[in-house]
């Protein structure tokens, strides 16, 4: 290994120490029995949602509860989170009034289907009357957090005294963990082949309580322009015109490397065999036809650290990387080797990856979340997850778009001396739910909120209002709503960190 390569790898290690915030460390996993592990094989995203306080008229049977007594849902949508200030200001206090509106549950007649349809999300209005107790005007920067993925990103709308304001978007990192593929017995260590989404509001408490997760989101993006990359670009692959019975001719690149000194990332490859003990790796891709979207696109092997050795390229009659697959005569590809850097090549790859496709956020934000996922869990860290062992950048980018994260909208307001203004946040809130459950618990949906988590804004009063629209039956809650008695607005206590509401349709 050359001194230059050693310096590169030292730089990579140093870079990750600085970039990877403790908040990115996967949360500690609870041990699962065999049945739970087997269930994880079929469902990559597992979740838990909130609470249990049955009201009069509620069901006697209840879904499985977590360790804290929370009702366990397989998909947890995350809580409604409170507004905070970029910099704490003792002159500013707030009165918070949150409304949970079940208007989307009202059936709407579909003429084409000849039936009523409805959604199971709700509308949330989270209003803050900000009061300035100081003797001078206060210019403050507001941050409003919300839980989402880029795939399902719908930005909340912020208004100040009724007028919509412009906002800037900040994205947090992956909020979940990783888990094995299943089949583990109690006490066995799991793997990291699957994503394991946040399971409860406590996961968000652990994520947000010390402020480091937010600080990372507000900070500057990692700079990897100083990481040198040796690029192997594969272009113009071809197969014989007469393929015979060969339906999937494939190009394979086989090479040797020292896994302790070299990292390989790829774009366009979709078959891989790696063997750290023997120091060998094989990467492959199907030769595209003209009708396919990747026809004419380059394929990349990106080598970081010490260069690979003994590269051989050949054509094979089928996909995969089985050693006994026969070779196919008449195949070929142009391979060009050149030097670049990780920033340039990642931008090149992501530009090609998103060509003609919307990414929900601008390119710089998209680039950043993919890079942070790669640096935290991909091949550039000693804590690499087996999910990314192939080095395929498509996997990292796909996860970066699909994983759940906390995001923030930022805006600036001026609260006059001795005066007040009202900031209102309006958004849709998805339900927490089960993919499958017994008949008695079918149709159960959960919604929850937290009062102070991650916020430095002093709320002198918090209230919650339920607009049930006559559509729901309350099963479990700790708000204190009573539909029969007409109690639909309640005062929340700051000492109660977490409030939850579990319902189903009134006519179910």
Where on the chain are the PLM-derived regions?
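Disordered, charged N-terminal biogenesis/targeting segments of membrane/secreted proteins
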Residues: 1-30
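Internal signal-anchor transmembrane helix that establishes type II topology
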Residues: 28-54
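A broadly tuned, weak detector of single residues within folded domains
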Residues: 5, 32-37, 121, 457
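Generic detector of low-complexity/intrinsically disordered segments
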Residues: 17, 26, 46, 57-58
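Intrinsically disordered, low-complexity segments enriched in Ser/Pro/Gly/Ala and basic residues
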Residues: 1-4, 42, 64
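Lumenal/extracellular ectodomains and adaptor appendage modules
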Residues: 52-508
């Amino acid at each position: 290994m050359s001194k230059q390569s050693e310096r590169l790898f030292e730089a990579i290690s140093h870079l990750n120490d600085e970039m990877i915030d403790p908040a990115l460390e996967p949360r500690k996993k609870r041990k699962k029995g065999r049945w739970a592990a087997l269930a994880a094989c079929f469902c990559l995203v597992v979740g838990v949602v909130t609470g249990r306080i049955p009201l009069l008229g509620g069901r006697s049977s209840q879904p499985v509860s977590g360790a804290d007594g929370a009702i366990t849902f397989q998909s947890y949508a995350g809580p409604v989170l409170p507004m905070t200030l970029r910099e704490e200001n003792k002159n500013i206090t707030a009165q918070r009034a949150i409304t949970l509106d079940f208007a989307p549950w009202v059936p709407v007649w579909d003429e084409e289907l000849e039936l009523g349809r409805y959604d199971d999300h709700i509308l949330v209005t989270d209003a803050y009357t900000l009061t300035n107790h100081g003797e001078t005007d206060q210019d403050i920067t507001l941050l409003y957090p919300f839980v989402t993925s880029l795939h399902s990103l719908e930005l909340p709308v912020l208004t100040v005294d009724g007028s919509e304001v412009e906002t800037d978007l900040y994205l947090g990192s992956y909020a979940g963990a990783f888990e094995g593929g299943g089949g583990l017995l109690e006490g066995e260590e799991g793997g990291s082949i699957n994503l394991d989404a946040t399971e409860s509001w406590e996961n968000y408490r652990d994520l947000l309580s010390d402020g480091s997760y937010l600080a990372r989101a507000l900070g500057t993006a990692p700079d990897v322009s100083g990481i040198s990359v040796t690029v192997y670009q594969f272009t113009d692959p071809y197969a014989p015109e007469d393929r015979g019975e060969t339906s999937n001719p494939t190009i394979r690149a086989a090479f040797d490397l020292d896994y302790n000194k070299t990292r390989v990332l790829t774009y366009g490859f979709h078959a891989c065999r790696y063997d750290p003990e023997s120091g060998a790796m094989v990467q492959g891709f199907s030769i595209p036809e003209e009708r396919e979207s990747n026809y004419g696109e380059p394929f990349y092997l990106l080598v970081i650290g010490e260069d690979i050795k003994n590269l051989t390229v050949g054509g094979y009659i089928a996909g995969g990387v089985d050693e006994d697959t026969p070779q196919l005569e008449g195949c070929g590809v142009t391979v060009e080797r050149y030097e670049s850097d990780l920033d340039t090549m990642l931008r090149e790859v992501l530009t090609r990856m998103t060509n003609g496709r919307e990414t929900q956020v601008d390119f710089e934000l998209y680039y950043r979340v993919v890079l942070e996922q790669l640096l935290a869990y991909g091949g550039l860290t000693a804590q690499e997850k087996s999910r990314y062992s192939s080095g395929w950048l498509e996997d990292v980018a796909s996860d970066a778009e699909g994983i759940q994260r906390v995001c923030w909208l930022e805006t600036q307001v001026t609260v006059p001396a001795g005066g007040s203004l009202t900031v209102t946040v309006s958004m849709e809130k998805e339900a927490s739910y089960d993919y499958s459950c017994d008949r008695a618990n079918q149709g159960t949906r959960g919604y929850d909120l937290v009062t102070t988590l991650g916020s430095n804004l002093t709320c002198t009063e918090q209230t919650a209002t339920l607009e049930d629209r006559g559509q729901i039956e309350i099963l479990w809650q700790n708000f204190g709503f009573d539909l029969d008695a007409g109690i639909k607005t309640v005062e929340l206590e700051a000492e109660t960190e977490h409030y939850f509401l579990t319902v189903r349709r009134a006519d179910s």
